[in-house]
């Protein structure tokens, strides 16, 4: 059987990696080996941060809800307890959106939560 050299296959593989490494700094988007190393690392960061993003947004929503609650003279934890007792099933994303964009509606929800306590 004849020996097969990797010319075309290697070029395709290198082009694929270098295409994914566009925008990287210096040799990390020009040299295959450096690009491959950086690409592997960047995919690890992407995997990690897709999970961290969920935590970060939840923290942001809680901060916003807490700030709006304190304007309505109630703490975040008492507000969430009141919502649970009043059987109001709104998630933190929706509550934070209401707190930011519709203060009157949020105040009405706070009043219901206070009543349930």
UniProtKB/Swiss-Prot annotation:
Give the GO cellular component terms, alphabetically: ribonucleoprotein complex; ribosome
Q: Which domain of life is it from?
A: Bacteria
Gene Ontology biological process: ribosomal large subunit assembly; translation
Q: Where are the transmembrane segments?
A: none
**Which GO molecular-function terms appear in the entry?**
rRNA binding; structural constituent of ribosome
UniProt-listed Gene3D superfamilies: 6.10.160.10, Ribosomal protein L20
**InterPro entries according to UniProt:** Ribosomal_bL20 (IPR005813), RIBOSOMAL_L20_CS (IPR049946), Ribosomal_protein_bL20_C (IPR035566)
Q: What does this protein do?
A: Binds directly to 23S ribosomal RNA and is necessary for the in vitro assembly process of the 50S ribosomal subunit. It is not involved in the protein synthesizing functions of that subunit.
What the record says about family reads: Belongs to the bacterial ribosomal protein bL20 family.
Name of the protein this chain belongs to? Large ribosomal subunit protein bL20
The gene that this protein is the product of is rplT
